[in-house]
UniProtKB/Swiss-Prot annotation:
The gene is PLIM2B. GO terms for molecular function: actin filament binding; metal ion binding; transcription cis-regulatory region binding. Keywords: Actin-binding, Cytoplasm, Cytoskeleton, LIM domain, Metal-binding, Repeat, Zinc. Pfam families: LIM. Cross-links actin with a constant of dissociation of 1.7 uM. One of its GO terms (cellular component) is cytoplasm. Its main location: cytoplasm. It comes from Arabidopsis thaliana (Mouse-ear cress). InterPro entries: Znf_LIM (IPR001781). Residues 194-205 have a biased composition (Basic and acidic residues). Binds to actin filaments and promotes cross-linking into thick bundles. Has an actin-stabilizing activity. The actin regulatory activities are inhibited by pH > 6.8 but are [Ca(2+)] independent. Predominantly expressed in flowers and in pollen grains. Detected in vasculature and roots. Residues 177-205 are annotated as: Disordered. This is LIM domain-containing protein PLIM2b.
Amino acid sequence: MSFTGTLDKCNVCDKTVYVVDMLSIEGMPYHKSCFRCTHCKGTLQMSNYSSMDGVLYCKTHFEQLFKESGNFSKNFQPGKTEKPELTRTPSKISSIFCGTQDKCAACEKTVYPLEKIQMEGECFHKTCFRCAHGGCTLTHSSYASLDSVLYCRHHFNQLFMEKGNYAHVLQAANHRRTASGNTLPPEPTEDVAVEAKEENGVSES
């Protein structure tokens, strides 16, 4: 009896990963031996990993690297160039309106091809791909993920700096998961919009 092939590629080494050796984290496949901290190469567990732009770290070094630089733009090795995967319009008009099994990771409602954005193996409505704290619109280069909860870098840095660690960020993330209703991320406030413009180098006229 021969084993059937698989199209799954490890998110770290980009080599084929078979079911018996596969870990699926945030919708992405990994070899068990590749699920390691990028900084110290220590083996990671579901309970002790953090992710920045798809790059894995143990929580100890994720916190340490932030303290050394004061932000997440330094000392972090850049991950793979990963642009949001916008689903192409199907060639047949009828297929545009057909059913789909994809659920938005933020609101858990059905997401159709024309309104879908895909990041780290998760599907989102374009309108749901926002910071869980301030509601800022995110891009593939401006988001941080902690236990599958999305943040913009500005608010992720801000939440970290409040107490020097992200224990309270995890508590807030868990609270959001258990809250009833699965509401959408908050709309950005005026202050948040101004901060986002300043970060992008756009000034008010």
